């Protein structure tokens, strides 16, 4: 988004965590310090950064702040916005209640709940439904506009009953997603291994991504179709060893390749090497990885869920299934037995992805920015005018 807005003639400054690793930053990037330790899942925690960000902002002529996380850096953004009279936009990227288990006490409660502990389950449910939602309500009210990446997330936010306007602004796809990659042929040859089909998925290897379901699903398919496919899992995370062990238990370890982290510019080559993109997560707000796959003419086979259903049209650019292993396996087998339908889906997938190219999305977001800035300035002028205007006081007659 920053690159496309710059292409349109705007100055965009990025404030991002310092990962303590070599990066080639430009003059528009500011790195704020983070704690040395990371919570589970390799998520960096911003340190006390208000003073650092405030000092940097004070030297820049900023018209608008767009923040992407509601905690810590989000509070810094709204505080600075209020102090400098700058409107603040927030994009609701994540179903935060589904990521509580990365914090140690809630991870402990999650384990207890999984073991059938009713007290742990009750406390966790209270935290998800009350603590998280109340915090988000408070934060969203401090913002001047909220972007939801999909219509389903916009609807999800309606029960929050906030006065802040909510607009739909999906994440755009960079040009590299639509390019042809010569490496795709070599990747397919390496991993297909004389099988008939090659599937892939791109995901953090974490519990909320539901990859254990995916492995059980492909195991069920193998039992019915035989050894006719391989699966590439791109990504890394805390569940990797557990997933490898599960693939061995299910006797599909020779069909599943854990590729690990792949750089963004190479992911499209893996997409182009495959026949179908498998997706099992039920915690997405948009599912940008689905659109990236579609850009490479790759149909998506996914569980019907928030975010996913906004981009996957069942039977057109992919297939949506329930989270029943039996139904999931049956639906996948049905696709594979209808190659003409699969070919048609490839074209529709590409057409869908083209609607999300970065340039189009940047123009859409720019319109929202302009509208917000104009309305914010009008409201600020009115408040300043009211505060500075003195009104005659009429003496009360007795």
Segments from the language model and where they lie:
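Conserved donor-binding/catalytic core segment of Leloir-type glycosyltransferases
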Residues: 192-218
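N-terminal subdomain of nucleotide-sugar transferases
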Residues: 1-33, 366, 370, 381, ...
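Short alpha-helical donor nucleotide-sugar binding micro-motif in glycosyltransferases
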Residues: 261-262, 269-274, 365
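Donor nucleotide-sugar binding/catalytic pocket of nucleotide-sugar-dependent glycosyltransferases
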Residues: 16, 117-182, 193
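Short hydrophobic beta-strand element within catalytic cores of glycosyltransferases
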Residues: 299-302
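Aromatic "clamp/platform" in nucleotide-sugar-dependent glycosyltransferases that forms part
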Residues: 282
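Conserved acidic donor-binding segment of nucleotide-sugar-dependent glycosyltransferases
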Residues: 314-315, 319-326, 334-340, 354
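Nucleotide-activated donor-binding/catalytic signature segment of Leloir-type glycosyltransferases, i.e.
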Residues: 242-262
